[in-house]
């Protein structure tokens, strides 16, 4: 899916790397705009957290999330012809906003991650924390 090759080497009867951990670490390294990423195995969902270092109105956030969803739907429509599920929540803490974006792992692609981070960078510019 992401083009990463998983190694399944045994060391003393144990697997040396776990593919899920490798995937999460790779996402954080390849996309420094992602502050943290969490995987929920039960729901097969990824939650990506982004930090914006300025106050953002609810109206502005809702407009951006709508634009993000439309962009992802268009991207996946062109790539696979399928609609995808997206959920977003935001937490405001003074002059800082934490944006949580949830997606199903099975339909997520590397191109989609690039699109998400590019749209966030375009919208929030220097205020988007890059780690």
Where are these regions (language model features)?
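N-terminal presequence-like segments and adjacent domain-start helices
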Residues: 1-19
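N-terminal topogenic membrane-targeting module
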Residues: 17-36
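Short, non-transmembrane amphipathic alpha-helical segments
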Residues: 24-27, 59-80
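Short beta-strand elements
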Residues: 35-37, 78-88
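A short interface-forming secondary-structure element
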Residues: 48-63
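Short edge beta-strands and adjacent turn/loop segments
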Residues: 31-47
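Alpha-helix boundary/N-cap detector
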Residues: 15, 19, 59, 63, ...
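Polar/charged, Gly/Pro-rich intrinsically disordered segments
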Residues: 83-131
């Amino acid at each position: 899916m992401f083009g990463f090759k998983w190694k399944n080497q045994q060391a003393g009867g144990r697997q040396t790397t776990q593919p899920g951990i490798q995937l999460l670490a790779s996402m954080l390294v390849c996309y420094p705009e992602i502050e943290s990423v969490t995987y929920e195995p039960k729901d097969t969902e990824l939650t990506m957290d982004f930090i914006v270092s300025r106050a953002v109105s609810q109206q502005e956030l809702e407009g951006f999330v709508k634009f993000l969803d439309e962009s992802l739907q268009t991207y996946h429509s062109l790539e696979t012809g399928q609609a995808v599920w997206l959920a977003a929540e935001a937490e405001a803490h003074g002059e800082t906003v934490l944006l949580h974006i949830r997606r199903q792992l099975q339909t997520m692609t590397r191109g989609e991650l690039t699109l998400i981070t590019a749209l966030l960078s375009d919208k929030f510019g220097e205020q988007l924390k890059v780690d």
